[in-house]
Each structure stands twice: as C-alpha cells, then as structure tokens.
Amino acid sequence: MKTPTSTIQTNAATATHGNLVSTSNANFSEHMDERSSVLTQDTQEFLTDLLNRQKTRLNELSSHLSSMAHSETFLSSLKSSMHWPVEELTCDKVVTLLTKLKDTDVAANSVETLIEKLKDSSRGILRADNVSSLDAIDISKQNDLLWKELETFRHIRGILESFLQTHYSKSSRLINQESVEVLMGQLLEHEKDNLRLREQVVEKETKVEDLLHLIQQEKDTAVKSNQVSRSTEATHIRLQNLVKRKETENQQIVTQIQSLAAVISGRKLEIEDLRREITHLKEKQTFEKEGLKKAFRVQKQKVDNFQDVMENLNTQIKKKETELSEVHSSCSIWKDHHDSAVETKTRLEVQHESLTKQISDHLKLIKTMDEEREQSKEENAEKISAIILENAHFSEENVKLKASIAALESETVLVNSELLEVREKASQQKHFAEQYENQVQKLQEELNKLKEKFKDVLTKKKEILENKASENKKVDTNDYFLGNESFKLENNRIERKCEEIRIKLEKMIMHNEQLESKLKGQERDLQRSEVELEGKAKECSTLMRLLENAVEAGNKQISEENNKVLSKELALQRKLQSLESELKRKRAEHKQLGCTLNAFEKTHNLRLEEIRHSLEMTESRNKSIQSYVQFLKTSYAAMFE
C-alpha cells in the first residue's frame, strides 16, 4: 500500500511549477504597464476569495474530521520565499504572493483527497470483521501525517498573516482598515476551526483504539462461535421441526380465529337487532306516554271546561231567576195576549179546515170532471172556467189568510216588545222599590232623630219653665229692687229671651206638626209599599220555588254529569294503572335485556381479550423462533464462510 506523502509531494510540485509559470506570464504581460494601485486591488480581491474558500473547506474538514498534509521541503521553500525585505510593494512581490497563495490552495486540495482516503479506510475497518496489523500501522501513519500537515498548514497561515500585516502596514493608503480587520477576524476563526479539528482528531484516535479493542473481542467470539457451531447444527434441525410444528399450530389457530370472528360477527348482528328492538320499545313507550299525557290533558281540559260550564250555568241560573222574577210580573199580560192569539189561531185553524174541506171537494169535482171529459168538452170548459173563478176566489182568500198570518206575526212581535217593556218596567219598579226602601230607612232615621230632638226640646222647655218660675219667685221676693234701673234692664233682657224662646218653641211646634204630617203621609206610603212588597214577596216566593225546582233539576244534571265524569276518570285511572303496569313490565324486560346484553358484551370482550392474548403469545413465539432461526442462519453462514 502506497503512502500518501509521496503522492502529495509530487502533486504539489507539479501544481506549484505550473501555477508559477502561468501566473508569472500573466502578471508580467498584463500588469507591467499598469499602476501599483490596480495590483493591490487585484491582490485584495484574490485574497478575500481565497480566504472565503479556505473557510468553507475548513468547515467541511471539521464535519468530516479532515486535516491537511504537506511536505517539510515545501514548508522550508515557503519560509525562504516569504522572508522579504521590508521595502515597497513591487510587481514581482505580488506575483510571488499570488503563487504562494495558490500553493496553499493546492495543499488544501491534497488534504481533501487525503481525508477522503482516511474516511474510506475507516469505513473499511468498521465493515471488516478482521483487521490486519498492516492496516492498523497504515492508520497510525496516516494519523501522524495528518498531525504534521496540520502543523505545517498552521505555520503557513502564520507566515501569511505576518506578510499581510507587513504588507497592509506599508500600503495603508491603498487598502481600507475595515477590510484588514475583516480578514484578521476570518483568520482568527480559521485558527479556532483548526483547534476544534485537532480536538476532533484526538477523539477519533480514541475511537480507533476502541474499535481495535472491539475487533480483538470479535476475533475471540469468532473462535468461540466455531466451537459452538457443531452444537448449533443439531439445534438447527430440532428447531426446524419445532418451526414446522408451530406452523401447523398457527394454521389451526388461524382457522379457530376465523370461526370465532364469524361467531363474533353473528353475535354483533344479534346485539344490533336487540338494540333496535330496545330502541323500538323505547319509542313505543315514549309514544304511549305522550298519548297518555295528551289524554290526561284532554280530560283535564274537559273537567276545566265542565267546571267553567257549571259556573256559567250557575250564573245563567241566577240570571234566569232574575228573568223569572221579571217574567212572572209580565206573565199575566202575556197570558192575555196569548189567549187572544190562541183564539185567533183556533179561528184560523177552523178556516183552514174549512178551506181544506173545500179543496178536497174541489178535487173530487175535478176527478168527476176528468171522468166526464169524454162525454162533453163544452161542459168541461164551462166547469173549468167556473173552477178558475173559484180558484181565484180561493187565492184571494189565501192572500187574506197570509195577511192575517202576517198581522198575527206582527202582533207576536208587538207582544214580545210589550214583554220587554214589561220586564223593563218590572226592573224599574224594583229599582223604585229599593229607592222607597232606602227613603223609608232614611225617614225612620230622621224620625228617630226628630224624636230625640223633641225630647231634648221638651226637657229644655221644662228647664226653661222651671227657670222662669224660679225667676218669678225671685222677682216676687225682690220687688224692692225693681226701682233700680239695672234690675229693670235685666228684667227686660230676660223678658226678651223669654219671648225669643217662646217664638222658637212655637216654630219648633209648627215644625213638629209638619214633620208629623209628613210622617203620617210617609207611613201611608209605607203601608202601600208594604202591601206591594207583600205581593212582590209572594211572587218572589213563587219564583223562588220555580228557581229551586230549576236549581234542583240543574243540580241533578250536574250530579249526573259529575257521575259520568267520575266514571270516565275511574276508567282513565284504570287505563293509566294498566299502562303503568305494562310500562313497569317493559322496563323490567328492558333491564333484563340490558343485563343480558352487558353480560354478553363482557363475555364477548373477555373472549376477544383471550384470543388477542393467545394471538400475541403465538406471534411472540413465532418472532422468537424466527429470530432464533435467523441467528442460526447467520451463525451458520459465518461459520461456513
């Protein structure tokens, strides 16, 4: 196996020679006549491009654990060529700088190729079961070369940094300070990347040592597997028999599972049918409940309507009682009118009977005339004319009868209007009677008040007379004081008071006489009103009897209707009880069905779980057998290889 150092050196020499020739010719032909400022700009652009490319390549190297390699002769040549005297920048120096930078690019390419080789060798090591000592030595050599080339690359970068620092310190007028700082930062980043790459290389070395240790262990295990291979052949045959047996058992289990799946599908269909029946029963129950509720509401409404009807009947009975009281007062008048109407009706009925008899006679005559028509047409014509005249006479009589009927109808209308007037008069008389009663009560109260006032007046009169008698006595005893004018004035005043009291007494007596006359008139009116009230009371008693009879009849009807309603309610209650018993029975059946369904579902779920468990067990056994068979196959293949 060739070492990579010789190939890298040859490639680097050829590349540097060709690059030097090409760059020298190009630079001398193109830039000899141009200014130094243009050269510095070109170098700046070229350096930035190179640094960017180096940064990307270093990132790739860090991801793939790459490193660079270069020869020591190349390093010495770079050192000798890069130590320039500190002078002004010339065209030759720029050309040498460009060549050196291109040499570093070539070195980076060679490092990439070396990294790819190292990667391939590491993959081969990882894939191979046995690793030779030559490969291990080759890996260690390549690792040493990588370390050396990384150091050389770092040294080259240091030289370039020193050169660039000297160059940019001399040419600060041409190049901006910002680009220099950017380049320095990029160089620092590259140094950091190199340090990280070194750490990764150390880690990879430790991993390679671990891999070598593992390879040695695998060799030991291979020796042991050769010893075990003989025992595995017998086990392989035995396992093949077991596999065949398990395959037959699996087929049987599959058939059982299929049969169980068919049974489960049938049971599921039965469960669905039972659920449908349950839903149907629930719908029936809800429908029957709604029907019962509706019937109960209808019966309630009927009872409420019946109660309203009863209340209306009571109000109507009360109204009828009042109307009967009014009608009873007008019955006598109505009876007279009715008797007259009956007489006219009887008279009209007699006339109608006579007319019907005449019509029947005329019909008989018409029949006879029809029979005699064949004998004499002329006689028939004369008779027909006579009949027409008689019919006209009868039509006139019918018109008269219609007029009399219309008159009777008008009379009935008048009678009805008179009845209404009589009712109104009766109501007015009732109102007047109530007013008279109120007036009588007021007059009685006034009489009581007047009697009390009269008694008070009499007591006052007695007191005044007693006072007068006492004063007369005083006057008799005190005659000797009459000479005095003051006593005279007092006597005059007392006499005036007495006269005023007498006038008041006379007025009171006159007023009492007037009140007594009014009371007598009012007593007469009261007697008359009492007589009228007694008559009305009798009428009211008769009306009350009639009303009581009507109320009894109404109560009988109400009791009958109540009995009917009670019988209907009892029937409804019986129906409700029967329906409730049916509902209870259906609910019990529903509960039983639910319990059976739950038990069936539980058993079904338990069976499914058992089947799944058995399937999982069989699958795990099959997998273990397959894994063991695979292990045997691999072990046999490794042994025979």
Curated annotation (Swiss-Prot):
GO terms for cellular component: centriolar satellite; centriole; centrosome; ciliary basal body; cytoplasm. It comes from the Eukaryota. Its main location: cytoplasm. Residues 83-144, 191-270, 299-375, 487-599 form a coiled coil. Keywords: Cell projection, Cilium biogenesis/degradation, Coiled coil, Cytoplasm, Cytoskeleton. PANTHER family: OUTER DENSE FIBER OF SPERM TAILS 2, PROTEIN BCAP. This is Protein BCAP. It comes from Xenopus laevis (African clawed frog).
